[in-house]
């Protein structure tokens, strides 16, 4: 018998700096739900990640005297590090600057 599928994705964190308590609260709740659904026997796919586009990022990168790409690389790796430190059970960590993500968005629009 095939397991029922369950897809979980919280809002992805905006990569304008370190995650705040709201980001952390949300990922803990999402992780709890994903773990509970797995316990219930569901085939769970839990995805999280970072949103890495926007003027705020460009301005923060400018202030830090680095490129926007360097800025989001640093912010995204810090967010991922914290989620991993908390042993979050996500299956995939996406970044909106990932080549695959950009291709899929272009297909839609």
Positions of PLM-derived features:
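N-terminal, positively charged nucleic-acid-binding surface of large information/translation enzymes
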Residues: 1-109
């Amino acid at each position: 018998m095939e397991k029922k599928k369950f897809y979980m994705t919280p809002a992805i964190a905006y990569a304008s700096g370190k995650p705040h308590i709201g980001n952390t609260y949300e990922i803990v709740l999402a992780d709890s739900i994903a773990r509970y659904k797995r316990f219930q026997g569901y085939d769970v796919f839990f995805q999280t990640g970072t949103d890495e586009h926007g003027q705020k990022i460009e301005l923060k990168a400018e202030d830090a005297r680095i490129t926007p790409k360097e800025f989001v690389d640093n912010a995204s790796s810090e967010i991922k590090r914290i989620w991993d430190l908390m042993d979050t059970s996500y299956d995939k960590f996406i970044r909106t600057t990932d080549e695959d993500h950009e291709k899929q968005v272009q297909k839609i629009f």
